[in-house]
């Protein structure tokens, strides 16, 4: 089901006390408001249960930022999809560019994580995107197609329909280069065409595709006005209610 979504990704930020204050502040800011999008916050594992218990989860969905590629057992330090689901979180961010780059997550590992997330009733927010060298070599379409196919194309149409995609132009994050709304629309439209070729138009048209490249209060309206951009996966701006709310209200 295609929806407008604004999802925050806190990354490795906030202590539990700080995270609870941030979540409660957002909950308060949304009281009495009916935004034209679903709102999700991705928090560290340590915060999930406390945050889910402290806010109105009908108004704000809670996401983990990762999960293990194993079901359970002797994997010290790992957190399984079942554990995430037991906290009250309903979503899990998978395949983020930082996980791919720093923790060497491969399409095969991510495929397993997606399957475990779905098996435990979690909605994956699956990230894709190319780095600067790939963009400059004109390989951006090829790269995102391979990322999608390598981790998701063994799913049935029914299961694929449960996935949220998030496109991150890795080349535009922290490089001083920015992706224009037109560039975002171009690749989102390409992604939707790739999905249509595999699963048909109905599945493609129903897929939510978020934009994850330095989206902020200044550019959110222009980005979200594009027909194939269904919202944003927000990093730094999600760590302050006064920066996150204008993005939510950009719809």
Swiss-Prot record:
Recorded GO MF terms: triose-phosphate isomerase activity
Alphabetical GO biological process terms: gluconeogenesis; glyceraldehyde-3-phosphate biosynthetic process; glycerol catabolic process; glycolytic process
EC primary class: isomerase
Subcellular location: Cytoplasm
Keyword Cytoplasm applies: yes
Keyword list, A-Z: Cytoplasm, Gluconeogenesis, Glycolysis, Isomerase
Binding positions for substrate per the UniProt entry: 9-11, 174, 214, 235-236
EC number: 5.3.1.1
Pathway, per record: Carbohydrate biosynthesis; gluconeogenesis; Carbohydrate degradation; glycolysis; D-glyceraldehyde 3-phosphate from glycerone phosphate: step 1/1
Active site positions, chain numbering: 96 (electrophile), 168 (proton acceptor)
Gene3D superfamilies, A to Z: Aldolase class I
InterPro entries in the record: Aldolase_TIM, TIM_sf, TrioseP_Isoase_bac/euk, Triosephosphate_isomerase, Triosephosphate_isomerase_AS
Cellular-component GO terms for this entry: cytosol
Pfam families hit by this protein: TIM
HAMAP family in alphabetical order: TIM_B (MF_00147_B)
Oligomer and partners: Homodimer.
Record's function text: Involved in the gluconeogenesis. Catalyzes stereospecifically the conversion of dihydroxyacetone phosphate (DHAP) to D-glyceraldehyde-3-phosphate (G3P).
Alphabetized PANTHER family for the sequence: TRIOSEPHOSPHATE ISOMERASE
Listed name of the protein: Triosephosphate isomerase
């Amino acid at each position: 089901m295609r929806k407008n979504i604004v999802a925050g990704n806190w990354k490795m930020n906030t202590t539990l006390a700080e995270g609870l204050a941030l979540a409660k502040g957002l909950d308060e800011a949304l009281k009495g408001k009916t935004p034209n999008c679903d709102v999700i916050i991705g928090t560290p594992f340590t915060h999930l249960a406390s945050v889910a218990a402290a806010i109105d989860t009908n108004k704000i969905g809670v996401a983990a930022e990762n999960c293990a590629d194993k079901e359970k057992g002797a994997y010290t330090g790992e957190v399984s999809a079942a554990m995430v689901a037991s906290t009250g979180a309903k979503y899990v961010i998978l395949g983020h560019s930082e996980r791919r780059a720093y923790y060497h997550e491969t399409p095969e590992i991510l495929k397993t994580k997606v399957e475990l997330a779905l098996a435990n009733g979690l909605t994956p927010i699956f990230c894709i995107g190319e780095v600067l060298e790939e963009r400059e070599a004109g390989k951006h379409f090829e790269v995102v197609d391979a990322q999608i196919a390598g981790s998701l194309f063994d799913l049935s149409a029914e299961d694929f329909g449960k996935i949220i995609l998030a496109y991150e132009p890795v080349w535009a994050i922290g490089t001083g280069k920015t992706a224009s709304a037109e560039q975002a629309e171009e690749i989102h439209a390409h992604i939707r065409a790739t999905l249509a070729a595999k699963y048909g138009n109905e599945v493609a048209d129903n897929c939510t595709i978020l934009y994850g490249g330095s989206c902020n209060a200044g550019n959110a309206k222009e980005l979200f006005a594009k027909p194939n951009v269904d919202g944003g996966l927000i990093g730094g701006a999600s760590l302050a209610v006064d920066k996150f709310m204008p993005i939510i209200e950009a719809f």
